[in-house]
Design a protein with these regions (language model features):
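Structural motif
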Residues: 9, 32, 74, 89, ...
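Amphipathic alpha-helical segments at domain termini/boundaries
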Residues: 24, 31, 65-85, 166, ...
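Rossmann-fold dinucleotide-binding core
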Residues: 113-182, 187-191
């Protein structure tokens, strides 16, 4: 069974980005979110992002219109019953993801592939909560999905070869490059990236440099497109903390201990750009460092 229809659970930054690239590649897309306002906002975000692609000359307006016509809001999870591939793109919280799979599995066609966009959690462990561990796989898109070329494919211990092959063909059809990671905490990209961000936060916490000094040092000294603290705000500090906790718990190494300052910011609700405040304050016309 070829993949023709894709269901996406979660209409936030990642889910809407995945829907965006799937529709541009010609897939029928059903986008679901438990919150109706997030679903409405997600579809509006896709349309706005495609409109910017048209304005910049990267997309024809006819392509935007055709792609948007392929995206349908799914107000109920039951609307995903006929999809060939279901992708969970909810928050990086294992309890939330398990609950989604428990609700979704009885609805899906028995032959449908079930995927998670988790950036750190064990694929094998998540698969064990489903009725189809052999047709369960990690398809980890990078943020922002329309711009980033890489997708990590991660097999659980039970993932069969047909599921892997179909998933790889699907990702390739989206115009993305595939890298295959083994099922270890945080896979490849975040196993390397998040400890670097965590170390930057420790550098701030210990007073080695200010927010501006740290980000400038890494932009100009290491040729990074954005500084690690700015990147943390973009990712979301709650997501950064979740990934560091997965690394720390899964690998039992103190080098992955989340910085206390990161923990404090998350406890304060300072999650970065999405809440208006993190290592930068985004509530004015221009972002301003908070420390």
């Amino acid at each position: 069974m070829a993949i023709k229809t894709v269901g996406i659970v979660g209409a936030g930054q990642m889910g809407s980005g995945i829907a965006h690239v799937c529709a541009l590649a010609g897939y029928d897309v059903l986008l679901h979110d438990a919150a109706a306002d997030r679903l409405e906002k997600g579809i509006a975000t896709i349309n706005g992002n495609m409109a910017r692609q048209v304005s910049s000359g990267k997309l024809e307006d006819e392509q935007r219109s055709a792609a948007m016509s392929l995206i349908r809001p799914a107000n109920s999870m039951e609307d995903l019953a006929g999809v060939d591939l279901a992708i969970e793109a909810a928050t990086e919280d294992e309890t939330v993801k398990r609950k989604i799979f428990t609700q979704l599995c009885p609805i899906l066609n028995p032959q449908a592939i079930l995927a998670t966009n988790t950036s750190s959690i064990s694929i094998t462990r998540l698969a064990s909560t489903t009725d189809r561990p052999e047709r369960f796989i990690g398809i980890h898109f990078m943020n922002p999905v329309p711009l980033m070329k890489l997708v990590e494919l991660v097999r659980g211990i039970a993932t069969d070869e047909e599921t892997f092959r179909k998933s790889k063909d699907f990702v390739t059809a989206l115009g993305k490059s595939v890298t295959v990671a083994e099922d270890f905490p945080a896979f490849i990209v975040n196993r390397i990236l998040l400890p670097m961000i965590n170390e930057a936060i420790y550098t701030l916490y210990e007073g080695v440099g200010t927010v501006e000094a740290i980000d400038t040092a890494m932009r100009l000294g290491a040729n990074h497109p954005m500084g690690p603290l700015q990147l943390a705000d973009f990712i979301g500090l709650d997501t950064c903390l979740s990934i560091m906790q997965v690394l720390h718990d899964g690998l039992a190494d103190s080098k992955y201990r989340p910085c206390p300052l990161l923990v404090k910011y998350v406890e304060a609700g300072w999650l970065g750009r999405k809440t208006g405040r993190g290592f930068y304050d985004y509530r004015g016309e221009q972002p301003v460092p908070t420390r």
